[in-house]
């Protein structure tokens, strides 16, 4: 019982941190005794989250351009590009969210 409560409290803390760091997500949650419910539509959260991640990746790339080339920076740039590709695959894996049923 305490483990469930601790897990729920940890989850709520994470959600509150995300809410604080990314107010543009406009998270709406309801907390009951044993569950946390997101009141936002999943599609809305998905779109906003993808946009935020892409924006953060662009900021990282711009920051990396300010430094001279080094192996560490090249690795960071490579990882940033890989993150973008992974994000694109995430979007494509959910293509059913964007297409009408036939």
Swiss-Prot record:
Question: Which key words are in the record?
Answer: Plasmid
Top-level taxonomic group: Bacteria
Record's protein name: Virulence plasmid protein pGP4-D
